[in-house]
Swiss-Prot record:
PROSITE patterns: RADICAL_SAM
A molecular function (GO) term: biotin synthase activity
Lineage, top ranks: Bacteria, Pseudomonadati, Pseudomonadota, Betaproteobacteria, Burkholderiales
Cofactor: [4Fe-4S] cluster; [2Fe-2S] cluster
Organism whose genome encodes this protein: Burkholderia cenocepacia (strain ATCC BAA-245 / DSM 16553 / LMG 16656 / NCTC 13227 / J2315 / CF5610)
Protein name as catalogued: Biotin synthase
Length: 339
């Protein structure tokens, strides 16, 4: 088993290029963040065009298959049982309801269907329904992704045997900032689950949330962690905090949109073959800022009116923006010639 390791923070001055072999110290990533904006965007677009069609964006739809009542205390999350957000816990959806939602997602142009459950980890009694969902969605011709919390080795193997394409398990933030957001799950717990997913042969979807009050260096620490996973994730969702009433982070000041765009660009440069996804919080960006995100190297986004328990730009707005920018929806496996 390849054991993911926490990357140490280093403060020495560094060159602009990534040290061989593909190793990004936090100081390297900070240096990218601090480039003049136009230089950073130019470099990110160059890297993007080396590996991807710059005018193709993959569309994913996310469905909450089990909402609320989560044992974890993630400070950003409305689904935590530790927070009073007015969200009621629900049981796991039945398979037919999930497949109906997947059919609707495909009809709306999505090529990947992601299923999220709010719990610390799935129980064995859940696995038959979960694997049936995976098989059913794949039969519709969609890529499959699940985010179910921590996994045991056997659970990862069961999902792999069912044909799961991607498993999402975010690092959320840097190791240094992590303790200010979450106390019920360790950073190493997250890394261990990523190892189990890799060992089972499932592609990794792993990113984080920015705008939680972290510093730029701590944002760089998240990107460093992601880029130094061996290998780095095939799919990297970047979330812009949605400050939900009733959560500990409800009063957090919004992140400067240009800092969000910078984060997309830095993710593209440090993980050149990854699919970089605009995820939660996209509604907070106007059309011009979303266009900048695509220029910075984002080539996937969550598509649909709801992301778990937060709103998302309406599909008609997305289609209109694509038309204005000359962007087309693309199948995930057709995005890159080199991925």
């Amino acid at each position: 088993m390849t054991q993911a390791q926490t990357v140490a923070v280093q403060s020495d001055a560094i060159p602009m290029a990534a040290p061989a072999p593909q190793r990004w110290r936090v100081a390297d990533v900070v240096a990218l963040f601090e480039l003049p904006f136009n230089d950073l965007m130019f470099r990110a677009q160059q890297v993007h065009r080396e590996h991807f069609d710059a005018n193709a964006v993959q569309l994913s739809t996310l469905l909450s298959i089990k909402t609320g009542g989560c044992e974890e205390d993630c400070g950003y999350c409305s689904q935590s049982s530790h927070h009073d957000t007015g969200l009621k816990a629900e049981k796991l959806m039945d398979v037919d309801t999930v497949l109906d939602a997947a059919r609707a997602a495909k009809a709306n142009g999505a090529s990947r269907f992601c299923m999220g459950a709010a719990w610390r980890n799935p129980k064995e009694r859940h696995m038959p329904a979960l694997t049936e969902m995976v098989r059913g969605v794949k039969e519709l011709g969609l890529e499959t992704c699940m985010t179910l919390g921590m996994l045991e080795d056997e659970q990862a193997r069961q999902l792999a045997d069912a044909g799961l394409d991607y498993y999402n398990h975010n690092l959320d933030t840097s190791p240094e900032f992590y303790g200010q957001v979450i106390s019920t799950r360790t950073y190493q717990d997250r890394l261990d689950t990523l190892d189990r997913v890799r060992d089972a042969g499932i592609n990794v979807c792993c990113g984080g949330i920015i705008g939680m009050g972290e510093s730029r260096r701590e944002r760089a620490g998240l990107i460093s962690q992601l880029a130094n996973l061996n290998p780095y994730p095939e799919s990297v969702p970047i979330n812009n905090l949605v400050a939900i009433e009733g959560t500990p982070l409800e009063g957090t000041a919004p992140l400067d949109p240009f800092e969000f765009v910078r984060t997309i660009a830095v993710a593209r440069i440090t993980m050149p073959k990854a699919v970089v996804r605009l995820s939660a919080g996209r509604e907070q960006l106007d059309d011009a800022m979303q266009a900048m995100c695509f220029l910075a190297g984002a080539n996937s986004m969550f598509y649909g009116d709801q992301l778990l328990t937060t709103s998302n730009p309406q599909t008609q707005r997305d289609r209109a923006l694509f038309e204005r920018l000359g962007i087309r929806a693309s199948q995930a496996d057709a995005l890159s010639d080199n991925a």
